Structures are given as structure tokens and as C-alpha cells.
Amino acid sequence: MKLFGLFLSFTLLFLCPFISQADVPELSRQPPRPIVFVHNDRSKSDPQQVHISLAGKDHMRVTFITEDNKVESVVEYGKQPGKYDGKATGECTSYKYFFYKSGKIHHVKIGPLQANTTYYYRCGGNGPEFSFKTPPSTFPVEFAIVGDLGQTEWTAATLSHINSQDYDVFLLPGDLSYADTHQPLWDSFGRLVEPLASKRPWMVTEGNHEIEFFPIIEHTTFKSYNARWLMPHTESFSTSNLYYSFDVAGVHTVMLGSYTDFDCESDQYQWLQADLAKVDRKTTPWVVVLLHAPWYNTNEAHEGEGESMREAMESLLFNARVDVVFSGHVHAYERFKRVYNNKADPCGPIHITIGDGGNREGLALSFKKPPSPLSEFRESSFGHGRLKVMDGKRAHWSWHRNNDSNSLLADEVWLDSLSTSSSCWPSSRSNDEL
């Protein structure tokens, strides 16, 4: 049985490129890099794959996995190392995927917590101590942003560069582990990102590589993703883990699902409409959106794949004066002007593709020529981005290219919040009322 399971695992890994729901024409890409598989070096009762995520106002969700099913879903925490004056009990789950069975996946919500404060915590009543820092409640606040991570040497370089400078929240617009039905790669990915994801909240949305539909064998989509990466959808009144929102300081961030229904009759559309309507731009001057398949793209890779979603939802984002839209999917970097309905518009969001995390498929090297006048910067390189929101009016965006041991600043721009632009709001909602 073990040999058959091993054979099956490698078979699934070989087949995954052919069963992916994101097939595109052959592209000019760098040669694929081998996967960096991170093995488990802890006991069955020790927590592993620890990561944290925001879970509503002043709360954090701690997720960890144990191989021992007897370990309780508890987290002890406090402001001093080894001294835990808080304790919370959560829930647990597990799942099966053909012959694979996951460990016990624990989700524990802790709080209330103080802003901009370091907490020390222990999971399951055993194992090593971790620490995290809560985001600030006021400006400035900084987000590290990258999509399409995977787990290769490229990925390791990206994570190292991100970790070399402080930030408050990590944003990932889809395509996490690139497990593609090979479930042990989900475990390896969790161990790979734990040094970062256990210290700062990781807020993610799904990409096509999280679908993991397999004919006959597995019809439930996003099974692994939903079990392992529980996001604050209930806290933001969403009925699905595939789309949700959260607030940090004065920034409202919306995570959308490119691979679930998005037409005007869908739950996601109705939720998004209600969510954006509740944002008070006086207290929350910035609105940022993340999704996987880009709505604007001048690369030959995945050309037009986000068009249906753009046609369905773009007006909602435009009418709400969303400031920036981040996407992944295309394994390159590209920054657009403020745009709406395929035209430059000073009241539309800036669109940025940041699908350059380092996955095994390599880079999408073929940009269309001549470049679109809407595209201001584009490059096929691995790297990551940082959005530092200085105050209610100004933010600084920078893209850092991977260059072996260094992280080089390759693109940057200052952004003005649309909440401060009186010309972008109807007279009934003048700037004085924002």
C-alpha cells in the first residue's frame, strides 16, 4: 500500500499540469525549478505549519497542525516570553484526499489584543514558543504583497527578501503551495512559510492552483485550501472562505474569488456590493482589493482570463473609488495607470500584477508589443511588493526585484487616496463629507 501510495503521489504530480483548469498556450518561460520539500522534524504532538491571520477587530486566528489527534485545540498567549495570561480554545478539522489524510488542523481565535504589540504564544499546550506582532491601529501601516509563491529556490529567495525588512501584514492574491492535488506539498508549504507566517498575519485568497478538482477521485473544489487557510469570512459577513474583507488601521482590504461565481446574481457580487457600501471613507480612507486573475494584463500569459469578472464587477469597484487592485496568476510584474473600462480614468483604481513569487512554473516572459499606453511598468522577474500607507492621503508603492542575494528596488510610485479627490465623488458626497 505504501509503494502504491507513493506511485500514486508521483503520478498525480506528473498529471497535474494536464488536469489544471488554467491551461494556456505554450509560453516562453524560464526552465522550471525543482520543488523544495520541507520535511517534518518535530514530534507528532508538537505543532507545525503554524500561521496566523486577522480574525475581526482586535483578534487573531492561530492555525496549526498536529499528527497526534489527542492534542487539544488551545493557544496560550501573553506579552512576556513563557508567561501566558490568556488562553483560548478553538476548533479542529481534517480532510481526506484519495489515500491522503491530513493531520489534525486546529483553528483558535485569540483576543482581544492590543494594537502594535508583541505577543508570545504556545499551541496545543506543548512544543516551541512563537511570537507575533499585531498591526498598528493608526497610520503608518505597511503591507508585503506577492502572489503565486510555490516552494522553490526562487520562493525561498522571495521570502528571505520579504523577511529582511519589517512589515505589518502579508497579502497573497492566490496560488499558495502549488500542491496541485499532491497533498504532502501542502504540508511542506506550511513548514516553509511558518517562520514568516507565525510572526505576521498572512491574508490570502485562492488561485486556480487551489481548485484541486480531480475527475472521479475528488469533486470537492478548494478542499485543502479551505481546511488549512481559514480566513475571516464569517467576521466580514461572507458566506464563503473564498471571499472576505478586513480592516487594518485606515485601510479596508477586500479579498475576492476569481474561481467562484461573480455575476450580479451571485452571493459574492451581493456581498461585495454590501461590503463596499459600509466603508466610511472618513475613518477608512483607503480601499484595496486583491484577486487572482488580473483584469488588466499585457502579457501573453493568461490573456483575457479575468475579463468576465471585470465585466461583472468593475463598476462596483469604480463606484466605490477603490484605490488599488492587486492580482497574481501572470508570473511577472506589471503596473497600470488608474483605469476604468479599458480607459485611463483618474477616478479608477491602479491595477498591479504581482504574480512573481517564485513558483515552479517559472516566469511569463512574453509581453505583447507595442506596450499598451495604460501600462506604466512591466518586467518578467521574480520579486515582491510593499505598500506603505503613510496617512489618509498618501501611500508609497515599491516593487523589489529578486537578484540572487539582494532585493533591488526596481519600481516605485506615490499614490494619492481617492477619498481625498473631490472631483471623483458626486456633489452629494463632496470631499468635506468624506
UniProtKB/Swiss-Prot annotation:
Fe cation binds at residues 148, 175, 178, 331. Its EC number is 3.1.3.2. Pfam families: Metallophos, Metallophos_C, Pur_ac_phosph_N. InterPro entries: Calcineurin-like_PHP_ApaH (IPR004843), Metallo-depent_PP-like (IPR029052), MPP_PAP (IPR041792), PPA-like (IPR039331), Purple_acid_Pase-like_N (IPR008963), Purple_acid_Pase_N (IPR015914), Purple_acid_PPase_C_dom (IPR025733). Residues 1-22 form the signal peptide. Zn(2+) binds at residues 175, 208, 292, 329. The keyword Hydrolase applies. The active site is at 302 (proton donor). Substrate binds at residues 208, 329-331. Binds 1 Fe cation per subunit. Binds 1 zinc ion per subunit. It catalyses: a phosphate monoester + H2O = an alcohol + phosphate. Expressed in roots, stems, leaves, flowers and siliques. Its cofactor is Fe cation; Zn(2+). It is found in: Secreted. GO terms for cellular component: extracellular region. The keyword Transcription regulation does not apply. Keywords: Glycoprotein, Hydrolase, Iron, Metal-binding, Secreted, Signal, Zinc. GO terms for molecular function: acid phosphatase activity; metal ion binding. Belongs to the metallophosphoesterase superfamily. Purple acid phosphatase family. This is Purple acid phosphatase 22.
